[in-house]
Each structure stands twice: as C-alpha cells, then as structure tokens.
C-alpha cells in the first residue's frame, strides 16, 4: 500500500458518498500501529477534505470497535480504518465501514469499488493542505471525548457492578496490547476496577 493507493481508494469512497448525497455527514478515520498507518490515515483525511467531506481523524491509534462506535456517535456516513488486521506486520490495509458502524456490504461495497475502478488517472484524485483543511473545519481531530463516550457505553453493559466493587481490588491483572491498539481504551483511567493504591 502507498499514498497513491490510499488516495485512489478514498477518492472512490468520496465519489460514492457525494453521489449518495451524504457528503455533509463526514467520515471517521482510525488507524493501527502498522508501518505508515498514521500517514495513510492523514492522506485519506486530506482527500476527503479536498472533496468537501469532513474527516474526523483519531489523534492516535484506536481499536476497530471504537471506530465503529465513532461512526455512529459522530453521525458519520462512513468510517475508514487503516489496518491489515491479523496479516503480517509488513502489510497494511484499508477497510471501509458504513453509517451503521459495520464493514461495508452490498450494495455499498460494489458501488464504492465501481467508483474506485472508474478512476483511471491519479490526476483525478484530490488532496488538500492540512493547515487549510483544519482552517476550513474539514479536518477534525478526535480526542478523549469519543474515548469517554465509548467507555461510558461499555460500562452500561456491566452485568454485576457490585461484584466488581467488592472483589475488583483483589484482582491482579496483567494486560498488554502487544502491537495492537488497545492501549488507549484499556487504561486505568477508563477501567471500573477499584485500586489498592
């Protein structure tokens, strides 16, 4: 993957969104810790901005479920995740989600691919200067507000908070995201476990 592939894929997505008349809703963008993920996600954001579509880009890496949440929380038409999931680390990938927060399915997948394939010249892809995109409000950085909302929704799913309150301080937990993206949402500031400190 390279910036030209990212730009072509994003231009196809932008064209599809514009033809659907949903360009005012924006697109949420997340990325993982793979090589060039931050750069590729910014390239996607600037292509969207150049097409007049607001790009909401996470300030740092985030997991896929949080992107899915952000698409719905921010009322976006789509989401982009720059990741190759479980594939070897030398690879990267580009996944698209629709406004329901799920990966694209028919007819959207076929419609987006048709738009991508219709781009036969890279001169037909657009980009914008980052400073200009921010100034025009077309590039918005997603920070802790979405993290907090996401964790708030997850906490609503707790089945027995009393058990956590009673026994949580005695649990010894070791967690590592390895090379993954769980380091932000799984931090002590977001966990509901009481501490001994």
Language-model-detected regions and their locations in the chain:
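An N-terminal, well-structured beta->alpha segment
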Residues: 1-44, 143-170, 181
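Hydrophobic alpha-helical scaffolding
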Residues: 3, 34, 56-57, 98, ...
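Ferredoxin-reductase
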Residues: 21-99
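Long, well-ordered, tryptophan-enriched scaffold segments
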Residues: 103-153, 158-159
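Conserved small/polar residues in nucleotide/adenosyl-binding loops
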Residues: 189-195
